[in-house]
From Swiss-Prot:
GO cellular component: membrane
Transmembrane parts of this sequence: 228-248, 273-293, 353-372, 393-413, 422-442
Name by which UniProt lists this protein: Delta 8-(E)-sphingolipid desaturase
First-level EC class: oxidoreductase
Catalytic activity, as annotated: an N-acylsphing-4-enine + 2 Fe(II)-[cytochrome b5] + O2 + 2 H(+) = a (4E,8E)-4-sphinga-4,8-dienine ceramide + 2 Fe(III)-[cytochrome b5] + 2 H2O
Endpoints of the signal sequence: none
Pathway field: Lipid metabolism; sphingolipid metabolism
Topology within the bilayer: Multi-pass membrane protein
Length: 573
């Protein structure tokens, strides 16, 4: 039997740079595995010091789950309270550095974070960084070791947690307070009960056979997409360029859903087979990197809608879905600052008007990100996923050959026609960007601390779209993002069957299940973007007024000093 590791022992190991994760009652050291992890290193870093049982079970199949305990170095025989991972700003010390601190207090702070700390960025020397720690200190919204409750409202008002003199901080604090009011208590025991009910739900989903893929439905999907490509190429041969481009764009839009399913290993449930399917349709036919998307998407699923950590809502300088993004946050995904610069200060206050126009150009940005991922080798370089990079590099090259050379260059008679075909086909894919952002842009972006359970976070930050069954193909499973976030490997065509079970679960644990019609959901997103835009406008106007007042004060002060000097000089004369 492995030895029991105390909370102090575990914190000491993390302080020494070890990648320690809790799975059930096992303590895992993933140092040797993290370089081979097909899902990337960032997703593991966000689980350091945490009980990742629900996350690990949700994202892996049974065969993979049986291998987890290879990395077991000990166990716990006591209820685990999550620590704040270093990548999120957690602070840890070695045993010989702080012997006076007991096991229970190791991850607690003795005081609230000060106002000054929240706006400081201190560079951490490379040799002093823990596993995953950013090059600058990250200050979480909820201080390390604090369990958020409604009592925090008083702390906000007394300026203990953050400085509410900043207009945008007041707004964000109110959003946190709303979440604390509208969602179940973040008490450790209550969140553990929610997690236990979620595990029962997962058992019901499995027992109902909902992990079994319906391949007939996928055959229909491929026939539908193949028909769109066929119509597009036929119209191209007739020189009906505009309609051909629209059909091609619609085919790409539908193809994204196949890649999404394959990336989650939810088609055949075989890692290599599903990735080959996903990479083929994404890079060879669509010109996009599945590897880039998976690296991004895995983190998104774990820290959904966190402005500091989730790349899916980090769209400055074009969009801000949280006022926290007004303060030049350091992205732990991109490892750089997201500057709220002059350009962002012009665009964000009108983002609700620019939302749809900007999404029309979304695919061009995905090309850039895909090539960066492949050329810079940002994906796995070891293990069973290492060869994916070269397959995708060949795929992206082939896409540029067949689309930009064979179709755009060879088939279009003029540069004007080439430009129109490219723009029309890419603008036609805009709808998928609307579908992607619809699920999260209007939802909570609050940081509620490390006690929040996996299921509550997913339900709090995601929304579903209500549509008739016959229209499911159009949304490609993205209309069930709540269910998908709870059970990422569930085949797309079974999500609707799981919906009733999820609704019962939500009713039992007291968590709101958010669902809107497509039009209503878009209205909610635009309304939220407008609210954030108004906050940006107000903050910038306040800054402008303060600057003017400071200038006026300086002017009057200088005038009085000058007058006094003149009078003094006259007296001397």
């Amino acid at each position: 039997m492995s030895r029991v590791l105390s909370r102090r022992d575990i914190a000491d190991r993390i302080a020494k740079g070890q990648t320690i994760v809790i799975y059930e009652d096992s303590v895992l050291n993933l140092d040797k595995w993290i370089k081979f992890h097909p899902g990337g290193d960032k997703s593991i870093y966000h689980m350091i010091g945490r009980d990742a049982t629900d996350e690990m079970n949700a994202y892996h199949d049974d065969q993979t789950i049986t291998k987890f305990k290879i990395w077991k170095i000990g166990r716990i025989d006591y209820p685990w309270e999550n620590m704040l991972p270093p990548i999120q700003g957690g602070r840890f010390s070695k045993i010989d550095e702080r012997d006076d601190i007991g096991d229970y207090d190791i991850n607690l702070t003795s005081k609230w974070r000060s106002v000054d700390e929240s706006n400081q960025y201190t560079k951490i020397p490379k040799n002093d960084r823990l596993a995953s720690e950013a090059e600058v200190k990250i200050y979480p919204k909820i201080p390390q070791g604090v369990v958020p409750s409604l009592d925090l409202k008083e702390a906000y008002e007394k300026k203990i947690v953050v400085d509410p003199a900043i207009v945008s901080e007041n707004y964000d604090n109110e959003r946190v307070y709303e979440d604390l009011t509208n969602f179940p208590s973040l008490d450790v025991k209550n969140q553990e009960w929610i997690a236990s009910e979620y595990r029962k739900l997962h058992g019901e989903i499995t027992a109902a056979g909902l992990y079994q893929c319906n391949y007939v439905r996928y055959l229909k999907e491929f026939l539908r997409i193949g028909t769109l490509f066929g119509i597009s190429f036929y119209l191209l041969s007739l020189k009906w360029f505009a309609i051909s481009a629209i059909c091609l764009g619609f085919a790409w839009q539908q193809l994204v859903f196949i890649a999404h399913d394959a990336g989650h290993i939810s088609i055949t449930h075989n890692y290599q087979v599903d990735n080959i399917i996903g990479m083929t349709v994404a890079s060879w036919i669509g010109g996009l990197s599945l590897g880039w998307w998976k690296r991004n998407h895995n983190v998104h699923h774990l820290v959904t809608n966190d402005p500091v950590h989730d790349p899916d809502i980090q769209h400055l300088p074009f969009f801000a879905v949280s006022t926290r993004l007004f303060h030049n946050v350091y992205s732990t995904y991109y490892d750089k600052f997201l500057w709220f610069d002059k350009f962002a200060q012009k665009v964000v206050p009108i983002q609700h008007y620019l939302y749809y126009p900007i999404l029309c150009f979304g695919r061009f940005n995905l090309y850039r990100l895909s090539w960066m991922h492949v050329l810079l080798g940002q994906g796995p370089r070891r293990g069973k996923a290492a060869w994916f990079r070269y397959y995708e590099l060949a795929g992206l090259s082939f896409f540029n050959y067949w689309f930009f050379y064979l179709i755009i260059y060879k088939q279009m008679p003029t540069n004007a026609e080439r430009f129109k075909y490219v723009m029309i086909s890419h603008i036609a894919t805009m709808i998928v960007h609307v579908q992607i952002t619809l699920s999260h842009f209007a939802m909570s972006t609050s940081d509620l601390g490390v006690t929040e359970s996996f299921p509550m976070r997913q339900l709090r930050t995601s929304m579903d779209v209500d549509c008739p069954r016959w229209l499911d193909f159009f949304h490609g499973g993205l209309q069930f993002q709540v269910i998908h976030h709870l059970f990422p490997r569930l085949p797309r065509h079974n999500l609707r069957d799981a919906q009733s079970l999820v609704i019962k679960f939500c009713d039992k644990v007291g968590i709101k299940y958010s669902i809107y019609g497509f039009a209503a959901g878009n209205d909610v997103v635009i309304s939220h973007l407008q609210q954030i835009a108004q906050q940006a406008h107000t903050m910038l106007e306040c800054a402008k007024t303060m600057k003017k007042e400071a200038t006026d004060t300086e002017f009057h002060t200088n005038k009085h000093v000058l007058a006094a000097n003149v009078n003094e000089k006259r007296k001397q004369e």
